[in-house]
A protein has these predicted regions:
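Short acidic-aromatic low-complexity motifs
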Residues: 9-13
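C-terminal catalytic core of tyrosine-transesterase DNA break-rejoin enzymes
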Residues: 115
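Vicinal oxygen chelate
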Residues: 1-6, 17-112, 123-147
Length: 147
């Protein structure tokens, strides 16, 4: 069963344009409500779907700036992480974690979009046995958080 993220933004129309410029998202449809807000904008990014909605505070539907951040990170598996990150930065995203080769076998970086959502961008480099990933994670996190 597929999973489709629904994310809340301040300005769903602007967000749809941003995701088109940043990640090549294709807008499939949108559902406006009488006051002009968008209940849904359905996008296709690669082989997946993403739904956007404007804030509806009267229903408790709030975007990251209204709640002080986000607890969710969206992930993109791409063929060229450097190109995707460069395109997203040109469109207005900020780099949170610069691209680096990781112990789990990806070239990986993280972005924050102008709407407060975080995106991991990963490019598969090599298969790493699970036991090696677990051992490397233990070493990487042994010292605690980086300061």
């Amino acid at each position: 069963m597929p999973i489709t993220p629904h994310i809340v933004v301040q300005g769903a129309g602007r967000a749809a344009a941003f995701y088109g410029n940043a990640f090549g998202a294709e807008e499939l449809d949108r559902i406006p409500v009488p006051d002009g807000r968008l209940m849904s904008v359905r996008l296709r990014i690669g082989g997946g779907l993403l739904h956007l909605a404007d804030e509806f505070p009267e229903m408790g539907v709030l975007a990251p700036p209204s709640i002080g951040g986000t607890a969710v990170v969206l992930a993109l598996d791409v063929a060229d992480a450097e190109a995707v990150i460069a395109q997203a930065v040109t469109a207005g995203a900020e780099v949170c974690q610069p691209l680096a080769d990781t112990f789990w076998g990806e070239r990986h970086g993280q972005l924050e979009d102008p709407f407060g959502h975080r995106w991991n961008v990963g490019q598969h480099l090599r298969d790493v046995p699970h036991a090696e990933v677990v051992a490397a994670a233990a070493i990487a996190f042994a010292a605690g958080p980086a300061s």
